[in-house]
Each structure stands twice: as structure tokens, then as C-alpha cells.
Amino acid sequence: MRSTKIVCTVGPRTDSYEMIEKMIDLGVNVFRINTSHGDWNEQEQKILKIKDLREKKKKPVAILIDLAGPKIRTGYLEKEFVELKEGQIFTLTTKEILGNEHIVSVNLSSLPKDVKKGDTILLSDGEIVLEVIETTDTEVKTVVKVGGKITHRRGVNVPTADLSVESITDRDREFIKLGTLHDVEFFALSFVRKPEDVLKAKEEIRKHGKEIPVISKIETKKALERLEEIIKVSDGIMVARGDLGVEIPIEEVPIVQKEIIKLSKYYSKPVIVATQILESMIENPFPTRAEVTDIANAIFDGADALLLTAETAVGKHPLEAIKVLSKVAKEAEKKLEFFRTIEYDTSDISEAISHACWQLSESLNAKLIITPTISGSTAVRVSKYNVSQPIVALTPEEKTYYRLSLVRKVIPVLAEKCSQELEFIEKGLKKVEEMGLAEKGDLVVLTSGVPGKVGTTNTIRVLKVD
């Protein structure tokens, strides 16, 4: 049984009913809807297909809507591409024009005010480096430090400046409306720079009468400066290594990844690692050795889930990529005992109980850890310790059942709601037996809250299945 969860992007290659069904059968836990592409109707159809199939198959499969955010891009060119040469002058303008080798438009009107002489501007995922030498009301004049080819609508990064961009765009608001309409499990927020961005997203969601978890994508230098504050107000974190590797020196990405995961785990927030997980499999049927090693190291770092993007959205081998990721994850998990997280807030009762639950389950060689839960928080806290046993999260809440599909080691089980906790546990144990997860004579460690309120994990019990 694989503990690490797999998140896959649904795109042109995989948005058919048949392909989504095959992906669920291969063990995909969360489907990502990328709102950088496609319209409302197109994305709604994906959601409806996933919901229909997960109900049909009785699988805890979640849906994550990834909000595109305020991505800064260059405009269209007169030709397919232009080549910039080192030392030449190149201008960025806020006017809408067709660009050439001397000038190109950008979609951020405040850019000339936001940057200053000496700032670095990166184009095309950092492949082209510009240095600001002069600004006017509508233009930013630069000198090319590292040249290369640019095509239409390339990404623009300015790691040294605090840009005046809205954290949520009008397009994002439309897709928040779509997600709340269909009660998706998660929203991912792009280009988070400060905790206020996350709080603003949550407020937008509440305008539609819903409370849906927000996963903050850490992909800017500004986010790293306020990382702990962002983690505290987020419901999960995504290490978005693509833009992050442009905003900071690329050699720092591995260390920063470890730091983000470690801090997220301290605060018991699920973590997704994304970008170029199996990049070579977009074209090739087999991964590189480096990709396989990267997957294992992300799991050793403590990642709850790994995200495939173009590999499943447009790649030639989407199903093979899922199979490879699953196989590598299972193999890496055999050695997780050497990479255990033990840091926690010792002043927090729920955290201390969860830590003790891990220790007790190891000492007794228990078959399972069972966490009756309303919100899912107990299961998330226990999972961060890389426990050897599966964590069965018994919940009467359908939304929690689906959301826990993102959390490593957790097996969500939808259990019948009961007025008495003991009755709920007894029925849950019976269901666990029926699923083949435990049998008579097995020891299970159970941790829950009394009197069953959200966020009050304060009890541990050891039960024998009979």
C-alpha cells in the first residue's frame, strides 16, 4: 500500500471519462484543475466527470482548483520569436504592441513604477536576464545581461522588486465561484507573497458561503521572507519549484524545499512538491535516474504528495508516469523510518497526544492507528511522524473524507454518524475489519478528542479487535 499521495493535472491528454477512470484505478488521489488554461465550461466538465467517477467507484478522490494568480507575461510578437543579444538595449512597455527585437509589451501597468535602476528582470523562466537602466511612465529600458530567444507571452519575474499586483485576479474570482458551486476540496493560490494574500483568498471563498481549504504555492522570493506567517494561515503548502527556481538561485532550491517542508510539518500542514517530477516522461516512456532520486528525496524530506503537471496534462505517457511515480514512492517508503520528523509544539496538547500516539503504536507494534475525526486535523497531526502503521481516519463528514486523500499514510473511511462516540468507534472498527485492514486479535491505537469537538485531540486508547 502506497503512503505518499499522487496529485495529477487533468489536461487535453487526460480529460476524457475513460482516462480519468484509468487514473483513479492507478491510484491517483487528487486531481488538479489548472485554471491558467481553459474556460469555465471546460473546467466544469472535468469536475463533473471526476465527481461522477469517484462516486461510482467509492474512492476518496479529491479535486484541487489551481488559481492562476497574477502571472506577469510579455505580449505577442511580430514574428514567432526574436533573439536578444548580450549588451543590447531592450525595452518593456505597458502599451499594447506587437513586439520585436527592441521592444515588447508587458501586462503589468505598474511595472515602470515598481522597478528601479539596477533591478534584475528575468524572462522565459530565467533564461534571459535583463538589468533596468531607466524608467518612464510607460517603459522600462534595460540592458541584456544574458541573451536568448523569446516567443509569445513568456513569463516575467522581478525577484528584487515588490510588485504592485493583486493577489487574486478577476479570472481567479470566476474560478473560485466555480469551485464553491461544485464544493471542490481545495484551492491552490499562486504567487503568494504575504499571509494577507491567503486571508484574502479565504474571504473570497466565504463570499460564496463556503469554507474550502487554501493551499499556498511558495514560488516567490517574497514568500520565503514571510514563510512561517504564510504557513500558519494556510491549510496546506505547495513547493512550486518552477517559478521558485527563477526567483532564487537555482542551487538553493533543494535546501529551500527541505526548509519549507520541515516548517510546514512543524505546523501540521500537508505539503505537495511540484514541478518537473517526471519531466522527461512528457516525451519518453522511462524516467531519468535523477528524476527517480528526486522523487525519493522529496518523500524523505516529508512530502505528503507529489504533483504531476505537464506529464499528465499534455504528455505522451500519462499513465506510465503515474505508474512510475507510484512504484518509486513505494520503494522509498520502505526506508522512511530513517527520516522521521520528531519536532512539535510541546505546549500544544493535541500535538503532544499525536506524538505519543506514534510512540505507543511503535512500542506495541500495533496494526493500525485509528483517528475518529470531524475536521481531519487529528489524522494530519499523526501522519507527520512517518508512522509505520496506516492511519485510518474514521469520519462522518464527506468533505473530510475527500480532503484527507491528500495526507500521507492516511486511509479515509466514511463512517456512519452516531450520537455516542463508543458506538461510532465500534461501527468504525467493524468497517475496518470488513475492509481487510485489521483482523481479530490485532492491536490498534486510537486517538480522538473528548467530547468530540473539532481540534481537541486529547485521548489515546489501545484496543484489541475482537
From Swiss-Prot:
Binding sites annotated in the UniProt record for K(+): N34, S36, D66
A GO CC annotation given for this chain: cytoplasm
Keywords: Allosteric enzyme, ATP-binding, Glycolysis, Kinase, Magnesium, Metal-binding, Nucleotide-binding, Potassium, Pyruvate, Transferase
Classification via InterPro entries: Pyr_Knase, Pyrv/PenolPyrv_kinase-like_dom, Pyrv_kinase-like_dom_sf, Pyrv_Knase-like_insert_dom_sf, Pyrv_Knase_brl, Pyrv_Knase_C, Pyrv_Knase_C_sf, Pyrv_Knase_insert_dom_sf
EC number, as in UniProt: 2.7.1.40
Catalytic activity annotation: pyruvate + ATP = phosphoenolpyruvate + ADP + H(+)
Residues under site feature: Transition state stabilizer: K217
Record has Magnesium as a keyword: yes
Tagged with keyword Cytoplasm: no
Regulation: Allosterically activated by AMP and inhibited by ATP.
UniProt-listed PANTHER family: PYRUVATE KINASE
Family: Belongs to the pyruvate kinase family.
Name recorded for this polypeptide: Pyruvate kinase
